[in-house]
């Protein structure tokens, strides 16, 4: 995934010489995984849950946050509780966060008659952005006076972390491939975790954002999921299934 919060898994990944790495946004990754075009990767949680018959978890690895994500943001022209009947624009990149947004708006806030549109239509009442695009929009947005961090809203609602992605690998992959990929991910994560400052410095130039802000951003993510993240996965799965979002 071409996002800063995925860099700890992929920078210097020792698998690059043997395997082809595909760089795609979460929604596209889910489509490719469903089509059999992906062997392993940090699958968007919603897509992994849809594909559990084909994919299994790869170690305890994933992308989660306990509180604010800073890169899963709903920008709105009015306060969230006043969005009844609103048109909500949803980035083409999102899979799991789009599902989370619906749970928040329709179940937490009990909003009615919402219309969701993919893309970024100018007439939308609110706009969901994720990843680096959301990080940048936090600084550049001039159209939407209200901003909501949807991962933080989940935290306030469910008192649990939010898991954006879990590492999955095809169940029919050879055992040696599964082991090799897992070891590669372990090595990349071990190498990059102490280097968040250097990664932030690099991306500050690419994204034209403050280096200190990006270092804090990277440090806020959980890449080895614990029991609280596993509980969050089960809660999200139950709610998404209950409301027919998977």
What spans do the regions from the language model cover?
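Short, hydrophobic alpha-helical packing/hinge segments within bilobed ligand-binding/sensory domains
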Residues: 29-32, 124
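Bilobed "Venus flytrap"/periplasmic-binding protein-like clamshell domains
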Residues: 1-15, 24, 70-125, 130-133, ...
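Pocket-lining segment of extracytoplasmic ligand-binding domains
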Residues: 116-199
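Hydrophobic/proline-rich hinge and linker segments of small-molecule sensing/allosteric domains
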Residues: 57-80, 156-172
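Hydrophobic residues within well-ordered alpha-helices
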Residues: 33-34, 240
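Beta->alpha turn/N-cap motifs
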Residues: 3-6, 25-27, 37-49, 54, ...
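A short beta-strand-loop structural module common to alpha/beta enzyme folds
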Residues: 19-29
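Secondary-structure end/capping motifs
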Residues: 173-239
């Amino acid at each position: 995934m071409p996002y800063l919060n995925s860099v700890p898994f992929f920078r210097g990944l020792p698998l690059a010489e043997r395997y082809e790495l595909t760089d795609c946004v979460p929604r596209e990754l889910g489509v490719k995984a469903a089509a059999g075009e992906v062997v392993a990767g940090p699958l968007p949680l919603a897509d992994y849950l849809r594909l559990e018959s084909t994919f299994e978890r790869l170690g305890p690895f994933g992308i989660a946050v306990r509180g604010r994500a800073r890169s899963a943001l709903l920008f709105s022209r009015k306060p969230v509780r006043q969005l009844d009947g609103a048109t909500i624009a949803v980035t083409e990149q999102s899979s799991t966060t789009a599902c989370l947004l619906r749970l928040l708006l329709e179940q937490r806030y009990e909003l009615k008659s919402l219309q969701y549109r993919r893309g970024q239509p100018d007439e939308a009442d609110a706009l969901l952005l994720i990843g680096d695009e959301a990080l940048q929009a936090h600084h550049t947005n001039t159209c939407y006076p209200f901003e909501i961090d949807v991962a933080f809203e989940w935290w306030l609602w469910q008192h649990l972390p939010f898991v954006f992605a879990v590492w999955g690998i095809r169940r029919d992959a050879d055992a040696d491939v599964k082991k090799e990929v897992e070891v590669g991910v372990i090595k990349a994560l071990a190498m990059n975790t102490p280097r968040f400052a250097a990664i932030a410095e690099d991306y500050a130039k690419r994204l034209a954002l403050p280096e200190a802000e990006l270092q804090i951003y990277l440090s806020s993510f959980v890449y080895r999921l614990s029991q609280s993240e596993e509980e969050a996965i089960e809660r999200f799965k139950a709610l998404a299934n209950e409301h027919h979002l998977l």
